[in-house]
Amino acid sequence: MRLRKIAVALMTAGLALGVASGTTYAAGGGSGPKSYNAVGKIGAVRMNPYDLAPLTAIIMNGGYKITGVSVSIAPKGPNGVALAYKVSDRKVLNHGGIPVWGLYPDHVNKVEVTYDRHQPGPTGSPTERITETYSIYAPPVSLLGQGVNQSTVLPKAVVVTPAAPALRNNLYLMNHLSPVLPNAAQVVWNNPAGGALEWDYESYVWIVDTSGDIRWYMKTDVLRDPANIYRKGNMMGFFQGKDGTLLWGMSQRYMKYDLMGREIFNRVLPRSYQDFSHHAEETPNGTFLLRVASSDFKRRDGKNVRTVRDVIVEVDRDGNVVDEWRLAEILDPYRDVNLKAMDQGAVCLNIDADAAGKTMSQEQLEDPNAGFGDITGVGPGRNWAHVNSVNYDAADDSIILSVRNQSATVKIGRDKQVKWILSSPEGWKGDLAKKVLTPVDLKGGKLDCQGSKCNNTDFDWSWVQHTSYKVNEKSRPGALHLTVFDNGDSRGNEQPALPTQKYSRAVEYVIDEKAMTVKQVWEFGKERGFGWYSPITSVVEYQARTDSMMVYSAVAGMGDVKALRAGKVKLEPWLHEFKYGTKTPLLEMKFTESSTIGYRSLKVDLESAFR
């Protein structure tokens, strides 16, 4: 009885408080006033609204209908870059308010927003055009690091050649990876063996403006968990679609998020595949191309293995498999001429100071007792191909691949037939030998080439290359323009007398697919020598909006792997943009104090992200 009286008394008091404050309560649960305070004329400011992007915020709509939104963020200091963008009405609805992107870290940002605020009431109620300025503090960059041999969270960008006016508002996504950390690479595949599950580095993804200031970064530990095989691995292959969202992969997953950090999807690979790395791309058909490997492959000797970086899968928007390219059945997985010439100290991100300068013999490559997995060797189940880019050619429904460990760029049709091979002719056999392109000069005359070397010309093949991309805007029938980052290790299918003779190049080729010829029309990097040399990773990509060539030598300074591991040298990647067809820099930026390994850079379009 006493408990009942207490309950009635509490209920009565609660009702009295509700009436006094003007609050009403909905049946089935409590409902009261909002507990946050609006700081402007709509709602509160919510920082990092999706947990993934700490330098973003949403100015909540406060219950109002908001349309006609534009946002600008004031530059920091005299050399800072102002950011300004419009937000479509549907994006305002997606985010429940005004999305704010590009805040400076550890800084009170001045953010001006302009919008139409619709008064409560039926459709057609009056609207008010409002402009107001918010002061929004964003916290410092905070990411997991290695702790030792590290002086900054992320590399510092130093502007060497200021951006030309046409490039002033450019934004560059940087994708780097850590050295192997103690909690990484602790598991391998088994039953069957092989694959590259242990390829597991902490990932660093951030965006800089043309003054080198950080304007966005990803809190990668929200997505990564090294203790979970389906949430570990390297974040790689970032691609921005026409809708402004980012597509990328991470070992056993591929995912799509918008620039605010909102998840579109985050999926495990289809069961026939494993070990995504390097490249993801959306086709004009709305499908996705992913560089993966086979989770169960039957070799000619009857053994079942997991393969390594030698399969391309195409999936639709719902994650259904559309097609696949199994390169061990299309190319020659036993071609070893380039494998024997590669410096084993730097095979993509597998950096081994003890193996620096060493090569492998044919006997080692073909050792029947050798294991399977992420090791240099011939045949399915070993790293014979190492495909690091996949580029769709809508002109004939084909794919163009950079097959690093073969020092070859290869075009393959939907029918799985090889159309052409851009590579030194050495080691190609049978029908594949007939697909190797013939080098010609600018006038179409055949060059004097013997094996892997061409005389009296600047023409060269590309060696352990990255990012073989068609330049759609320049190509026409009979002239397919192709850009390649020629890393330069194993140049001429050999190691030079001195490591310091090595160099890298950004190259543009023009291919006549009917005549089966190739000519070199532009290069940069040879003149920069060993200091600009990147034995692994890197990118060159044509930029249509500014008619320029973006080049990122992502691990410049890694030429001496032993000195790097001993802490005697530091990586200093270089980011450039050149006026098309020239070596005139429109922008040059050097990254210093780097304790990370550069992979790629990607120009980001802010307008499409909020359209």
Task: Specify the residue positions occupied by each region the protein language model found.
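Histidine-/acidic-rich catalytic cores in large beta-rich domains
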Residues: 28-75, 89, 93-97, 105-611
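C-terminal segment of classical bacterial N-terminal signal peptides
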Residues: 17-25
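Bacterial N-terminal signal peptides that target proteins for export
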Residues: 1-10
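Solvent-exposed beta-strand/loop surfaces of large extracellular or lumenal domains
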Residues: 81-89
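Intrinsically disordered/low-complexity terminal segments and short unstructured peptides
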Residues: 11, 22-23, 122
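Bacterial N-terminal signal peptides
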Residues: 10-18
